[in-house]
Amino acid sequence: MVENLDKNIETFLKPISDSITGFVFGSFSFFGNQIPFIVLWLVFASLYFSFYFRFVNIFYFKRALNVAFGKYDDPSHPGEITHFQSFTAAMSGTIGLGNIAGVAVAISIGGPGAMLWMIITAFFGMTLKFVEVSLGHKYRIIHKDGTVSGGAIRYLSDGMGQLGYVKLGKFLAIFFAICCIGGSFGGGNMFQANQAFQQIVEATGSENSPLFNKGWLGGIVFAFIVGFIIIGGIKSIGKVTERLVPLMAFIYVFSCLYIIISNFGLIPETIYKIFSSAFNLDASVGGFLGSLIAGVKRAVFSNESGIGSAPIAYAPAKSNNPVSYTHLTLPTTCT
């Protein structure tokens, strides 16, 4: 029974996962490619806000770094954590497996050109994240005990309410909360834990590993570790991420540089393949639309622009100016 537990869990969850994926990524056919409506919406929103705010992702990038590293910190401002703690809390969700596995999946589906579309999506997605985090910070609620409630739930309910759409705002907030819970179990936990555990299994002997076919055990261990951290709330999370994320980022960047330097001679050929595949106008899977769709979908999963999770992490930061403070979101989209 225990030996088949992994398979039983997968058998149970796969139909549920497929149904949710089909609903979220509802699509239409265009020149032989299935284009999800949500992809078009995110692309349009990213482009619109980038032009509307006159490319804040370029001209305020330096200020974003200054805010992130505490230049404008003020302990007297309302909130629970510092700018750097909120920055690292958000970064902890964007650095890592989404970037590694996400890029590999995008390339396998859309060809090398998907990598270019991931980069372009991240560039314009910087402004999209800036907007959603600004709204999350503006409509946050600071309770009497000093704790903060914020995020998409607040700006959907309160923001839409101010526009006169009270019932619609409440419905969207409730719907988002339900989706957020589902997303945290799926992409936020199961995928991350599964991929991390698979690496441990590979490093300890693959099929001969004592942990082989015991993914459930890895899930329990990861759940215990994460639970120990998050049970203390956002302050506990911030204290851990401000120490752990810089180390994680250093290892990540060092590993990337090592791989690039080790394969330095292949860089020109790789760049050529990326651009030639990205602008290939064939109707095949590796064509223009296939690369674009694969790149955008994986980029959103990787950098979390437009999905509503980032405002939750940034809302508790100590600040009295949502627009000035949320410049620090810009660098997180580049990871």
Residue ranges of each PLM-predicted region?
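N-terminal alpha-helical transmembrane segments of multi-pass membrane transport
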Residues: M1-L97, I107-A114, G125
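Select transmembrane alpha-helical segments in multipass membrane proteins
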Residues: V39-A45, T82-A90, Y165-G182, G218-V221, ...
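Membrane-interface loop-to-helix entry segments
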Residues: W41-F44, F49-L65, L172, A193-I200, ...
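Helix-loop-helix module between adjacent transmembrane segments
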Residues: F49-S50, M91-S92, T121-V148, S157-Q192, ...
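Juxtamembrane inter-helical linkers in multi-pass membrane proteins
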Residues: A64-P75, I142-G159
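Juxtamembrane helix-boundary/capping and inter-helix hinge elements in multi-pass membrane proteins
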Residues: I107-A114, R140-S149, G161-L163, A315-Y325
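Acidic, glycine-rich loop-and-beta core segments that form the ion-binding/anion-interacting portion
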Residues: T241-V245, A249-N321
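Conserved small/polar residues in nucleotide/adenosyl-binding loops
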Residues: T326-T332
